[in-house]
Curated annotation (Swiss-Prot):
Residues annotated for ATP binding in this entry: N36, D78, F123, R372
Organism: Leishmania amazonensis
SUPFAM superfamilies in alphabetical order: ATPase domain of HSP90 chaperone/DNA topoisomerase II/histidine kinase (SSF55874), HSP90 C-terminal domain (SSF110942), Ribosomal protein S5 domain 2-like (SSF54211)
Subunit structure, as described in the record: Homodimer.
Protein name as catalogued: Heat shock protein 83
Superkingdom as given in the UniProt entry: Eukaryota
Gene: HSP83
Family: Belongs to the heat shock protein 90 family.
Extent of motif TPR repeat-binding: 697-701
CDD domains (alphabetical): HATPase_Hsp90-like
GO cellular component, one term: cytoplasm
PANTHER family in UniProt: HEAT SHOCK PROTEIN 90 FAMILY MEMBER
Organism placement in taxonomy: Eukaryota, Discoba, Euglenozoa, Kinetoplastea, Metakinetoplastina
Keywords: ATP-binding, Chaperone, Cytoplasm, Nucleotide-binding, Stress response
Entries under SMART domains matching the protein: HATPase_c
A Pfam family of this chain: HSP90
Amino acid sequence: MTETFAFQAEINQLMSLIINTFYSNKEIFLRDVISNASDACDKIRYQSLTDPSVLGDATRLCVRVVPDKENKTLTVEDNGIGMTKADLVNNLGTIARSGTKAFMEALEAGADMSMIGQFGVGFYSAYLVADRVTVTSKNNSDEVYVWESSAGGTFTITSAPESDMKLPARITLHLKEDQLEYLEARRLKELIKKHSEFIGYDIELMVEKTTEKEVTDEDEEEAKKADEDGEEPKVEEVTEGEEGKKKKTKKVKEVTKEYEVQNKHKPLWTRDPKDVTKEEYAAFYKAISNDWEDPPATKHFSVEGQLEFRAIMFVPKRAPFDMLEPNKKRNNIKLYVRRVFIMDNCEDLCPDWLGFVKGVVDSEDLPLNISRENLQQNKILKVIRKNIVKKCLEMFEEVAENKEDYKQFYEQFGKNIKLGIHEDTANRKKLMELLRFYSTESGEVMTTLKDYVTRMKAEQNSIYYITGDSKKKLESSPFIEQAKRRGFEVLFMTEPYDEYVMQQVKDFEDKKFACLTKEGVHFEESEEEKRQREEEKATCEKLCKTMKEVLGDKVEKVTVSERLSTSPCILVTSEFGWSAHMEQMMRNQALRDSSMAQYMMSKKTMELNPKHPIIKELRRRVEADENDKAVKDLVFLLFDTSLLTSGFQLEDPTYAERINRMIKLGLSLDEEEEEEAVEAAVAETAPAEVTAGTSSMELVD
């Protein structure tokens, strides 16, 4: 007997929306149908814990996918709990779920169709690819019933004989003509791997297997005849003589159908980390990341209590070439809810600086109506994110225990650690412990800030550092001369990110950072050193004043330096302005903010080394005649040279002319000799005069 029912208004509206609106991402229907089958298996499994008889003859729970090209149907079966007649009527038609209206509102707000399963109405996604759906189900407490609808506003319920049922539940999709691609084994395998690989039960796909079989001509003829007549092949006795004759054989192709398990990679995160081998982690990592190399670090953990989720995080061996591109969409951490795949680009699950970490998060608590639109406001997700960051930091600390392993890690992902210091204020202290730098004392091995502090001299009051292009350049920088003389270690910061890091951090373990290229650097001095410094300032006062007048607005001031010991002079920037290295970086940016650059590129201060012979001689000449023309030339030359040695860019093109004049003076050349040399050079390069009788054509030849 067949009964007809009308869909509840909201469900009818939802089905109409699904059928009449074009969605490009129709493939999600299979995910939702398999997910429902998995839920049915979960329910029967829970019941069997108290009543094992509910499983009947079932030895294991599974989900089967059967494509039928001849009838253009795709069937999904499971041996889960099944549905009664009342369940079919209520759950699939007459009682609207809370998610129905919520999902339609989300669609109107711009949500993606792929979120349908998370609103508890995933069953209806079947109508994305099918024009008719049939559900045959058998619950232990009821008979077999068939639910069927073509989404025309009504559905029917019909009783059926139990002999029709192989498994307790079967949903058959009668595919639309333009959706027959979902009958291809290759396409189905792809979708199962993408969306349902970590379902807790075997997903078996019916596939065709072609094998070659060797048969005799007589066997083939008998088989054909039996097929035509519908009779069983005759069995005849064969005498020894007949059997001894050699029969002709040939190979024929035989097509068989069999079930093939598709989700062979079981969800490792549900297992105890102690029971998972390194090889299993590596295989799992390669499956989710498409990487070919084993991960050097793994963190497998679970969080229980008010919030429950499991996760596995991996550090890849190499950084992707486009890792830090701002517009790159990252899909490194896959989000599952109760082992059902939700999304692979959940940007709010992990901060940008951890964009290189790959892994899986499976939550038991995220609501079914989670969507991209409300992920940011979801409190559960924020707690998950906080725990992921915490566990990743623990993983990095574990890697750091082995210096060689951490060296490789830092080469690949040191920039991310520095980006984290810039962005993540809550974890800045822990991230700073992961930093590594070369220094004047470390040689070819990088040092930690913690180790630096333990090596600090008793009279040292700051952590000294210098920024620049390379370690080699910084080792010979004039800025570190006095620090080296006093035995103070200086950190070399050679990456662009270091500049941004030092803008955010001011101290480490109560020791302030001091940039040796900026103003405000003071070393602890004895009373004798202080007295001597005051004398030098007084002695050089007139020289400093004269040099400031000559240089004008090129410098803010000229003072006696505390940081030089062998170089004549340097240029330093203000304490809160850009360093020379930062200024060069900003100049090279195509989209730089000119107004900001003008503000941050503060006036430079020229510092003199009063003990240097050049400065002593210059001071003597100024005191003898402050209007000496040679003094002005020397001051400009010293300034330009200081620009170069301090890491700035030359802006005055006359620098080369001044150098040439200095070379002439060194060679004791006067103006007349120079003019004669120039005239001789011009004469040598001039074309020879055309002799009489030589034609222009001959010259051309």
